[in-house]
Amino acid sequence: MASSQVGDMVNGNAEPTRHLAKFPPSLWGDRFTSFTLDKQLWDKYGNEIEVLKEQVRSMVVAGGRKAAEQINLINVLERLGVSYHFEKEIEEQLEQLFAKFEDNEDYDLFTIALHFRIFRQHGYKMSCDVFNKFRDSNCEFKETVSNDVQGMLSLYEATYLKIRGEGFLDEAHAFTIAQLESLVEGPHLSSDLSEQVMHALKQSIHRGFPRLEAKHFISFYEKDASRNETLLRLAKLDFNQLQLSHREELCHIFRWWKELDLISKVPYARDRAVECFFWSTCAYYEPQHSVGRAGLTKIMLLLSVTDDTYDAYGTYNELKLYTNAVQRWDVSAMDELPDYMKALYRALLNVYDEVERDLAKQGRAYGVHHSKEAFKEIVRSYEIEAEWFKEGYVASFEEYMKNALVTSTGRLHTTSCFMGLEADVATTEAFEWILTKPKMVAASGAIGRLVDDVMSHDEEQERGHVATGLDCYMKQHGVSKQEAIVELYKMIENAWRDINEEMLKPTAISMKLLIRVLNLSRISDVVYKYVDGYTHPEIINDHVISLFEDPIPM
């Protein structure tokens, strides 16, 4: 993210010229400042959930079920958002199913594509050759499957698990989109199935926000004549109970942010406490990660204000002072800063102290150092962009991306997210892995950086902004804006391929860690799908309300 400040104080007297971004204000007022958890309702949900979990666990491990039926059960559990209760059992089942899988089984397209997606989601490298039997001698899809809406939908979702070099899945992706759009426009689909297809075309399973997609699927599954009432009941109860937890956490975060009162001292910045918590909930929604969600949200809030300071307020000389202060990470450095920066710097140091104290209670404070170092690195890269803007410099695309992969926050968000995980998962080796600049973290950062560059380009250039990836690519290659956008989206797709490949076994680190990097990539797809939904929070307003306020009717 970049710098839009111009001018500096003359002899320390005149107020410098500042190109303010005039960001939209917070949407929420005092909406989330008070919430009282209904303990009786919580206990009621919890007691029934425990009973249902044991019933479902028995279903998962029960023998005698055909492989296709077992894969379908696992798929339903995952899409209903309750599979996290049965991770061990599901992994054991999938290991057996993958070892025994025979692609000469008389499976239809829906079933083959479902196997492919589920196996790949769990790290098993199933070959896309399994789809060859659905193509004719011209390598085109047979007419018998082209009009199979469930088969097309299943294959469409499976194509999002592609890796580099799988041209067939690229072709299948384009083909299934065209077929599904045609089928939706026709007269033969039921309204329920049509709604399901339209939602899938807008948001794929693999790139979606897990809890939001679970809520959507619950509404579809409820209308399915073959639904299992036990699974449906568990999903509804689990969503509503977890929503109560998240709402209580959001209330604590929101009150903390109001009491911190930082925005009154830096009114140029985006006020996004709710949106940062929304982001953190995508990274990890499970109940045991409440401390992690709080810490990640607080760090994201301070980074957001820091970004806006470099991007839309601070002068170059002020920013150099702030960069130096952050590198020192010492309260005495505050003396050299302008008043508004003192408030931000004090908040930064205090937030990290708070997070470190909270994690120390659980013996997990060792990751805080890595998060601090990542924060320092981002600030150094923000200053580079500020200098580029001051000089009117347009970097080569390669030079831009080298710096942008830092400002994309991939390392900081991943490190800060890992801090909130269990000590036996987020080990010291996990933090050292991040320092190696792994392909998956770089890919996640590239997705966030490039999609943001595309979606925020016009608005940022209007107010004055360092050249973004879009500008750098246009200048270097002599192409139009639209041509550059096409190329940037190709890069985004390749980044997704890299993420998918890094999650195939054997993995560099635990899948429990890699899924967090995937989730941080997913939020970029959701928030920046059509516009910059972080800067313009009304775009994701419905998502926030659905996730934190509206329970599922029982």
Curated annotation (Swiss-Prot):
Identify the Gene3D superfamilies for this entry. Answer: Farnesyl Diphosphate Synthase, Terpene synthase, N-terminal domain
Pathway in which the depicted protein is active? Secondary metabolite biosynthesis; terpenoid biosynthesis
Quote the record's binding site residues for Mg(2+) 1.
D307, D311
- Give the GO terms filed under biological process for this record: diterpenoid biosynthetic process; sesquiterpenoid biosynthetic process
Q: Which domain of life is it from?
A: Eukaryota
| Catalyses which reaction(s) | (2E,6E)-farnesyl diphosphate + H2O = valerianol + diphosphate
Disulphide bonds in the chain = none
Q: Which SUPFAM superfamilies match?
A: Terpenoid cyclases/Protein prenyltransferases, Terpenoid synthases
Task: Give its E.C. classification number.
Answer: 4.2.3.204
- Which segment of this protein is annotated as the motif DDXXD motif? 326-330
Does Endoplasmic reticulum show up as a keyword for this record?
no
Q: Where does Mg(2+) 3 bind?
A: D452, S456, E460
Q: Which UniProt keywords apply?
A: Lyase, Magnesium, Metal-binding
Name a Pfam family for this protein: Terpene_synth
Cofactor remark from the record = Binds 3 Mg(2+) ions per subunit.
UniProt-listed CDD domains: Terpene_cyclase_plant_C1
What is the recorded function of this protein according to its Swiss-Prot or TrEMBL entry? Terpene synthase that catalyzes the biosynthesis of the terpene valerianol, which is a volatile compound of floral scent.
Report what the protein is called: Valerianol synthase TPS1F
User: What gene is this protein a product of?
Assistant: TPS1F
